[in-house]
């Protein structure tokens, strides 16, 4: 349906997505599940990393094997909800550097407002993975990607747990070359800009605050 969008439908991911949708799931379990889903998604997001062949000596003989070909990675959570996905990603790619972009959505205009930014100094040399649990209007994601490009970023991927078609279309319109990885594409947005059926406000549920 959508070009450059990858829906990761692994049974474990889909099971855990069902659990975080449940309004009865508390903050502690919600945080753990988001971390687990992010770790599982990282497996697919990094599937296209280049490899190089090396030789290693085993206790028995010399083996020809493969390792990742020196790619530098960066994980960029969009604050605050994106923080919930960082530790899961780092479990699979522990050498990645982590930057932060603080963008919130104005409740009246639904437009993104930037309030914080701290990025790796070598951002132009890294393949970046922008993480945010929800892709609703796409405003925050588009703004974050635009800001990263201004700083010299060349290769960017966007990873969301749940996306609305409106958000996907917005990212495609502004940044058509950026691949989007999601666990679910939902029906759309309600009049308040929330994803339906979604899971509510991911930041509130992660941290137990509104």
From Swiss-Prot:
Q: Which GO terms describe its biological process?
A: UMP salvage; uracil salvage
Which cofactors are reported in the record for this sequence? Mg(2+)
* Reactions catalysed: UMP + diphosphate = 5-phospho-alpha-D-ribose 1-diphosphate + uracil
The entry's keywords: Allosteric enzyme, Glycosyltransferase, GTP-binding, Magnesium, Nucleotide-binding, Transferase
Q: Which GO terms describe its molecular function?
A: GTP binding; magnesium ion binding; uracil phosphoribosyltransferase activity
Pfam families given in the database record: UPRTase
Q: Where is the signal peptide?
A: none
User: Binding positions for uracil?
Assistant: 195, 200-202
- Which pathway features in its UniProt record? Pyrimidine metabolism; UMP biosynthesis via salvage pathway; UMP from uracil: step 1/1
* Free-text remark on how the cofactor is bound: Binds 1 Mg(2+) ion per subunit. The magnesium is bound as Mg-PRPP.
Instruction: Quote the record's binding site residues for 5-phospho-alpha-D-ribose 1-diphosphate.
Output: 80, 105, 132-140, 201
**Which HAMAP family does UniProt cross-reference here?**
Upp_B (MF_01218_B)
Query: What family, per the record?
Result: Belongs to the UPRTase family.
PANTHER family per the UniProt record, alphabetical: ADENINE PHOSPHORIBOSYLTRANSFERASE, URACIL PHOSPHORIBOSYLTRANSFERASE, CHLOROPLASTIC
Protein function = Catalyzes the conversion of uracil and 5-phospho-alpha-D-ribose 1-diphosphate (PRPP) to UMP and diphosphate.
Q: Could you identify this protein by its name?
A: Uracil phosphoribosyltransferase
Q: Which organism is it from?
A: Thermoanaerobacter pseudethanolicus (strain ATCC 33223 / 39E)
Task: Provide the gene name from the record.
Answer: upp
